């Protein structure tokens, strides 16, 4: 039960701490290389991915 509580608090704190944007920026920076390789066609796809990086990266 203590572990569960800790996990819940960590999840809540992490979401409140705004780690998602930071992760998104890292992914965008990493994707920048792939974006250049992929071309402009991938730009809109990556833009949509920014909103849902987890879903996009699968």
From Swiss-Prot:
Keywords: Antibiotic, Antimicrobial, Bacteriocin, Isopeptide bond, Plasmid, Secreted. The keyword Ribonucleoprotein does not apply. Its main location: secreted. Induction: At the onset of stationary growth phase. The record marks 46 as: Essential for permeation into bacteria and for RNAP inhibition. Peptide antibiotic that functions through inhibition of the bacterial DNA-dependent RNA polymerase (RNAP). Inhibits transcription by binding deep within RNAP secondary channel, where it sterically blocks the folding of the trigger loop, which is essential for efficient catalysis. In addition, it also seems to restrict access of nucleotide substrates to the catalytic center, and shows a partially competitive mode of inhibition with them. Exhibits potent bacteriocidal activity against a range of Enterobacteriaceae, including several pathogenic E.coli, Salmonella and Shigella strains. This is Microcin J25. Changing residue 44 to C/D/E/F/G/H/I/K/M/N/P/Q/R/S/T/W/Y: Loss of RNAP inhibition and loss of bacterial growth inhibition. GO terms for cellular component: extracellular region. There is a cross-link at residues 38-45 (Isoglutamyl glycine isopeptide (Gly-Glu)). Changing residue 41 to A/C/D/E/F/G/H/I/K/L/M/N/P/Q/R/T/V/W/Y: Loss of RNAP inhibition and loss of bacterial growth inhibition. GO terms for biological process: defense response to bacterium; killing of cells of another organism. Residues 1-37 form a propeptide. It is found in: Secreted. Changing residue 57 to A/C/D/E/F/G/H/I/K/L/M/N/P/Q/R/S/T/V/W/Y: Loss RNAP inhibition, and loss of bacterial growth inhibition. The record marks 41, 44, 47, 56-57 as: Essential for permeation into bacteria.
């Amino acid at each position: 039960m203590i572990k569960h509580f800790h996990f819940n608090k960590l999840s809540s704190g992490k979401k409140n701490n705004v780690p998602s944007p930071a992760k998104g920026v890292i992914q965008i920076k990493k994707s920048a290389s792939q974006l250049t390789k992929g071309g402009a066609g991938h730009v809109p796809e990556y833009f949509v991915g920014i909103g849902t990086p987890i879903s996009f990266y699968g």
